[in-house]
């Protein structure tokens, strides 16, 4: 969890002991070592540029960029993605970059604007859209992932996650 907001760390702190073990680390702790059987997810702050972005990219095989349906987020995403495209590993296609619409309300004008923008991003994959709903609040409070929560209440969320899981090849 490299984001000062600490959302990932907070989620891990809420995780029940009887669930699969997930190790966490913050930028203030010794970094986790990645083995061939390990997936390491870095939660980084928004609007990272320059040498900090370069440092994060060197550790990545894939980058998922969530974008919320708001004029400010869309503008920030355009700037970030233009910067990201100029980075060597992205130019050489050594890193896959995927886009996710986050907290989407499908039938709103701003979501349609975001959806159109993400579809048109050249060289980047628009993977899926996650709807805005309370299951993510429940997930944050319980330390559970969507696929660990009740199937009947998360069925639509699971469908929205499947394209991302497939893209990540998890």
Each model region followed by its residue ranges:
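Conserved beta-strand segments of the P-loop GTPase G domain that flank and frequently precede/overlap
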Residues: 8, 41-43, 65-68, 99-102
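Conserved C-terminal guanine-recognition region of P-loop GTPase G domains, centered on the G4
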Residues: 75-103
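NTP-binding/hydrolysis catalytic cores, primarily Walker-type P-loop NTPases
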Residues: 145-170
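Inter-motif core of Ras-like GTPase G domains
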Residues: 51-71
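Beta-strand-loop-alpha "switch" segments that mediate conformational coupling across diverse proteins
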Residues: 105, 115-147
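P-loop/Walker-type NTP enzyme "switch/lid" segment
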Residues: 1-58, 140-144
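Conserved nucleotide-binding/hydrolysis micro-motifs of P-loop NTPases
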Residues: 4-6, 71, 104-107, 135
């Amino acid at each position: 969890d490299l984001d000062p907001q600490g959302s990932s760390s907070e989620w891990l702190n809420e995780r029940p002991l009887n669930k699969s073990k997930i190790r966490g680390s913050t930028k203030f702790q010794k970094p986790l070592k990645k083995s061939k059987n390990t997936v390491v997810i870095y939660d980084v702050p928004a609007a990272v540029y320059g040498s900090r972005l370069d440092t994060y990219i060197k550790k990545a095989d894939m980058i998922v960029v969530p974008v919320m349906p708001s004029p400010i987020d869309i503008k920030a995403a355009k700037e970030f993605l233009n910067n990201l495209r100029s980075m060597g590993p992205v130019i050489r296609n050594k890193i896959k970059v995927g886009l996710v619409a986050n907290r989407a309300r499908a039938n709103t004008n701003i979501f349609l604007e975001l959806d159109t923008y993400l579809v048109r991003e050249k060289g980047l994959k628009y993977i899926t859209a996650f709807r805005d709903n309370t299951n993510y609040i429940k997930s944050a409070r319980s330390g559970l992932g969507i696929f660990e929560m009740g199937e009947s209440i998360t069925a639509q969320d699971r469908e929205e996650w499947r394209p991302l899981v497939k893209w990540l090849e998890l």
